From Swiss-Prot:
This is Small ribosomal subunit protein uS13. Residues 94-118 are annotated as: Disordered. Gene3D superfamilies: 1.10.8.50, 30s ribosomal protein s13, domain 2. Part of the 30S ribosomal subunit. Forms a loose heterodimer with protein S19. Forms two bridges to the 50S subunit in the 70S ribosome. Located at the top of the head of the 30S subunit, it contacts several helices of the 16S rRNA. In the 70S ribosome it contacts the 23S rRNA (bridge B1a) and protein L5 of the 50S subunit (bridge B1b), connecting the 2 subunits; these bridges are implicated in subunit movement. Contacts the tRNAs in the A and P-sites. The keyword Ribonucleoprotein applies. It comes from Shewanella sediminis (strain HAW-EB3). PANTHER family: 30S RIBOSOMAL PROTEIN S13/40S RIBOSOMAL PROTEIN S18, SMALL RIBOSOMAL SUBUNIT PROTEIN US13M.
Length: 118
């Protein structure tokens, strides 16, 4: 197993699919990385040489991925909550942020129903 950005990449998968296992890299970005490093998208990770894996590591290092990206997202949410803006308040109350109705739906975001006390 190759290790890129602190993640063990599965050997038996194609390069594009294997790169999407890294948080912050989707199909489009994985294809762009393969294009810049001139590695075939359908080549399996186990078929790549160590030099090609090193070029993949360098290409992935140019992007914000994994722990840094998770930290950045959580800091953005925390900033919204500290500002007290509408989106921050919705985050704090665990409600939908983007204008969805909450009278009947939004069970995933709100969690299980709480019984009404009498």
């Amino acid at each position: 197993m190759a290790r890129i950005a602190g993640i063990n990449i599965p050997d038996q998968k194609h390069t594009v699919i294997a790169l999407t296992g890294i948080f912050g890299i989707g199909r489009t970005r994985a294809r762009a990385i393969c294009a810049t490093t001139s590695i075939a998208e359908d080549a399996k990770i186990k078929e790549l040489s160590e030099a090609q894996i090193d070029t993949l590591r360098e290409a992935v290092a140019e992007y914000t991925v994994e722990g840094d990206l998770r930290r950045e997202v959580s800091m953005n949410i925390k900033r919204l909550m500290d500002l007290g803006c509408y989106r921050g308040i919705r985050h704090r109350r665990s409600l939908p942020l983007r204008g969805q109705r909450t009278k009947t739906n939004a069970r995933t975001r709100k969690g299980p129903r709480k019984p009404i006390r009498k």
